[in-house]
Amino acid sequence: MVLLTLPFLTCSKRVEYGDPAATETLTIDFGSTDLQMIAEKMVGSLLASPVVQQGHRPVILVSRVRNKTDEHIDTKAITDKIRTALVNSGAVRLVADDVRKEVMQELGYQAESGYVDPETRKRIGKLVGAGYLLTGEITSIRKKAGRKTDLYFKINLNLVELETGLIRWAEEKEIRKGQKKAVIGW
């Protein structure tokens, strides 16, 4: 009986919680550390830019970062991290692009259904228009030579003034990682 239960005891996995801010170095692929470094650099630079420093709290529409790499990267996570930091800074105002359809449906419901108290319903035509569009992309270059792999990521963000089409702010963050496979191993 003891011999039958021994394999189950030795093969069990141990789960641990980790610090989300700790450097993650399991692979050279895009990871949480990269996401945090990108968001920190981009948000810090944008908040220090003349567009934001003018003091009028610009209204920005944040579009999703485009993935131009050869791997799956959750660009929504990048966009969400940047959006959250910008909102929490209080220095800018953001237009909610990803829920615009739901907002329009709710406004229509309040205006036309007859179920919403006229004293509390919100009026159509009061949405705030964005003055700027924050857009960007992430690209990568992967090189292999023997047992070595080099991976380079670059993310670019641009803040475009919607009325003029002028780029009012731009920033990039570069990340390079290297990995050397062991001679023997998996």
Annotate the PLM regions.
Residues 90-96, 125-127, 164-171, 186:
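Short C-terminal domain-edge/linker segments immediately following a structured domain
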